Design a protein with these regions (language model features):
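C-terminal motif of bacterial Sec signal peptides marking the signal peptidase cleavage site
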Residues: 7-9
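An amphipathic, aromatic/His-enriched active-site/gating alpha helix that lines ligand/cofactor pockets
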Residues: 53-61, 80-114
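Short, glycine- and small/hydrophobic-rich beta-strand elements in well-ordered beta-sheets
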Residues: 52-76
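Mature N-terminal segment immediately following signal peptide/propeptide cleavage
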Residues: 27-44
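Glycine-rich beta-strand-turn "strand-cap" elements at beta-sheet edges
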Residues: 11-28, 65-71, 101-124
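Sec-dependent N-terminal signal peptides
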Residues: 1-3
Length: 124
């Protein structure tokens, strides 16, 4: 399944629910994406909008895109949300729902998407 199909699937009212820690309900999404080598600039340009808008969501702690320094066609989205409710709210946004259509012709293969919870972190 490609990123576009996965994004479209999530926006089609599929609930992604994960058992959360009572002590720390934070959730992270790690999405690894392979992009067609000649489409990396277009992909980054398309990603900027979802990054900017997602970072303004009340429940989003951060939403960033990283690029593999050894293979410029490989990218990783790293997202952190305050809880499951924030993840669900993100999946319901127009910018999330529209992202799949924007990148459908840019991706080279299936995405690897993981939703994880925080197991331990430094006390502040």
């Amino acid at each position: 399944m490609g990123v576009a199909a996965l994004v479209a699937g999530c926006s089609a009212n599929k609930q992604v629910s994960v058992k959360q820690s009572v002590e720390n309900p934070k959730m992270m999404i790690i999405a690894k994406v392979s992009v067609k080598p000649d489409k990396t600039r277009d992909f980054v340009a398309a990603a900027r909008e979802i990054i900017e808008k997602s970072n303004k969501e009340a429940g989003c702690s951060f939403y960033q895109l990283y690029q593999d320094p050894y293979d410029n066609s490989r990218f990783v989205f790293v997202e952190e949300y305050k809880n499951q409710t924030a993840v669900d709210a993100h999946f319901a946004t127009d910018h999330f729902k529209g992202f799949g259509a924007k990148i459908g012709d840019l991706v080279a293969g299936p995405a690897d998407i993981k939703i994880i919870t925080v197991a331990a972190e430094a006390k502040k």
